[in-house]
Amino acid sequence: AHCITADALNLPLADASMDAVLFQHSFLNMPDSAAVLNECRRVLRPDGKLVMHEVVRGPHANAMRYPVPWASDAQHSHLESADQLRQQLEQAGFHIDHFIDWSDDALAWRQRQRAKETQQSRQAVLSPQLVFGERFITMGKNLVSNLGEGTIRVVEVGATVG
């Protein structure tokens, strides 16, 4: 097994050559997610799996607080609703095996992480704050608020080429 990182709109892979495609907190950065799903469908073998752990737009998306880890403002955020994601998956030729909302668990985890971040006297060696710098304190706070207020949701999706 091997891992490839590439442009999701133009994967350097032959048709029907992969057993699985994995996305984790990626779609929120992709302005043309329908085209990305079509590209995934192209490279997956028959019965290939698409696995996603993604942030989607919640019922109160208009109240989104920025910055967040994926976008400094609304112009750079490409969140879609869970219903839009389902529809795009089906239109791209996927059968949805499961679609689970993990938002409550994600919120609880993020709250625990925030508590650790504020208690630590020194920054952990590997952390989002290492990447984002001091901005991550605000991003993390906004992420917790957005999850708690229903502006975003976190979902797990398993789908099969069908």
Residue ranges and their predicted role:
Residues T5-D7:
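Adenosine-cofactor binding site in Rossmann-like domains, unifying the SAM/SAH pocket
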Residues L9-V21:
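A short acidic, Gly/Pro-enriched loop at the edge of an enzyme's catalytic core
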Residues D19-D32:
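A short SAM/SAH-binding and catalytic strip from SAM-dependent methyltransferases
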Residues A34-K49:
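A short glycine-rich, Lys/Arg-flanked "PGG" loop and its adjoining helix->strand segment in the class I
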Residues V55-H76:
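Short, glycine-/aromatic-enriched active-site segment of Class I SAM-dependent methyltransferases
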Residues S77-F99:
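Short alpha-helix
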Residues I100-G162:
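Conserved Class I S-adenosyl-L-methionine
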